Amino acid sequence: MNQTNFGFKKVDYTKKQGLVNNVFSNVADKYDLMNDLMSLGLHRLWKDEFIRQIPNLNSHILDVASGSGDIALKLAKKARDRVNNISLTLSDINEEMLKQAKKKAIDLNLFQNLKFTVASAEELPFPDDSFDYYTIAFGIRNVPDINKALKEACRVLKPMGKFICLEFSKVKEGYIKDFYKFYSFNIIPSIGQMIAGNKEAYEYLVESIDLFPSQDEFRIMIKDAGFEEVGYKNLSGGIVAIHSAYIQ
């Protein structure tokens, strides 16, 4: 029986997605607030830098593991302000999270040119060569089979299409690393209990971050999936990294 990690626990591969779904369904209504509290607001700066990696907004963009829609809605607003003809597809396996994204899109009057699809990153319901950009922010570490998801990204991107991933990474500086680990394992779950009423969900999230491959390890995984010109950029001392690659 194939096993994989659900945080620090070993679980049957076929059960992980359901467990992850439960985590996000249980915290969906507090997700955005928790992001602000956990990152001390830094996630907004990280995401702003992330969308700068997309210079051409007259494009077909797929945002995978879209969650509450932060990345897609930032792109939609930027495109509207510049009068660009953007086409955005928001995909997430968790319907509750997509409901949050739809609500935000309506509230911000950004619903035009948006499509919403409930789908697994491992089995995307799109034809080959469909998108100019594939974005995924803080989502790929939750996928049961990351290699399979990377190959799907490769498949749905057009030739010369760009893969862009924002994910928690490995801090190298000693004093930052020590503080970050203490904050992650001791403070974040407590905030999760106080705000979202779910300490276990945030223990899983912290553990999943700790287990995610290093910047260089993930770069190799991306290259092995079939991408070229693979690179990454550290933000905030390596707390997160932006990974990018192209389809030739």
From Swiss-Prot:
Organism of provenance: Rickettsia conorii (strain ATCC VR-613 / Malish 7)
CDD domains xrefs: AdoMet_MTases
PROSITE patterns in the record: SAM_MT_UBIE, UBIE_1, UBIE_2
Pfam name, any one: Ubie_methyltran
Key words, A-Z: Menaquinone biosynthesis, Methyltransferase, S-adenosyl-L-methionine, Transferase, Ubiquinone biosynthesis
Pathway membership, UniProt: Quinol/quinone metabolism; menaquinone biosynthesis; menaquinol from 1,4-dihydroxy-2-naphthoate: step 2/2; Cofactor biosynthesis; ubiquinone biosynthesis
GO BP of this protein: aerobic respiration; menaquinone biosynthetic process; methylation
EC number: 2.1.1.163, 2.1.1.201
Keyword flag Transferase: yes
Protein name according to UniProt: Ubiquinone/menaquinone biosynthesis C-methyltransferase UbiE
Recorded family membership: Belongs to the class I-like SAM-binding methyltransferase superfamily. MenG/UbiE family.
Lineage: Bacteria, Pseudomonadati, Pseudomonadota, Alphaproteobacteria, Rickettsiales
Annotated binding of S-adenosyl-L-methionine, by residue: 68, 92
Reactions catalysed: a 2-demethylmenaquinol + S-adenosyl-L-methionine = a menaquinol + S-adenosyl-L-homocysteine + H(+); a 2-methoxy-6-(all-trans-polyprenyl)benzene-1,4-diol + S-adenosyl-L-methionine = a 5-methoxy-2-methyl-3-(all-trans-polyprenyl)benzene-1,4-diol + S-adenosyl-L-homocysteine + H(+)
Example GO molecular function: demethylmenaquinone methyltransferase activity
